[in-house]
Curated annotation (Swiss-Prot):
Protein name: Suppressor of hydroxyurea sensitivity protein 2
Subunit structure: Component of the SHU complex composed of at least CSM2, PSY3, SHU1 and SHU2.
The organism of origin for this protein: Saccharomyces cerevisiae (strain YJM789) (Baker's yeast)
Location within or outside the cell: Nucleus
GO BP, sorted A to Z: DNA recombination; DNA repair
Tagged with keyword Disulfide bond: no
Key words, A-Z: DNA damage, DNA recombination, DNA repair, Nucleus
Amino acid sequence: MSKDVIEYSKLFAKLVNTNDDTKLDDTIASFLYYMFPRELFIRAISLLESSDMFIYILDRVHNKEGNEHTSLIDVLVDEFYKGSSNSLLEYRLIVKDTNDGAPPILVDIAHWFCSCEEFCKYFHEALEKTDEKEELHDVLINEVDDHLQFSDDRFAQLDPHSLSKQWYFKFDKICCSHLLAFSILLRSSINVLKFFTVNSNKVFVIAIDNIDEWLNLHINIVE
């Protein structure tokens, strides 16, 4: 089935069992398993349950006494699900690399980028297969300018705030478990976000209110 038919973000949104929000829905999970190659979905779920995923937020507002963790989740809900954030949220999606001494992995679902080896491998493969007359943009991005063809799917969507066009990265060409895991978390539903960050407490949301610490975070990624 094509990207035009399947709305992946709606499938991700159904991952949490409607009768028991402490469990995943096995039927939906089994269906999604077959939607992605190289056991990507299994690896993404394993990553979400690994305690190796972190969301760092440059925070000058919600870092107050009281229930700080809940307020940070509310910040993410406003940014990714309600679109009611009053200012541009500065955040970084980080995965701890399991290889000793390796730098953290930076994930950017807004621009469909990951610093991992798997992403780089498939990006270079796509680059090698690109004809000299072809633009890389045309090879990797699906542009939709017909409003009748617009989709509600948010998975692999670029610049979701545009009203005139829609752009989707062709994830069937380049995708990794890190991009898929964070997409499941942030491009699905509030229930799924809270399942992994609050209920199971496997994905950590951390506020940084000191600009020096924020810069050190980026230095550690580069190193």
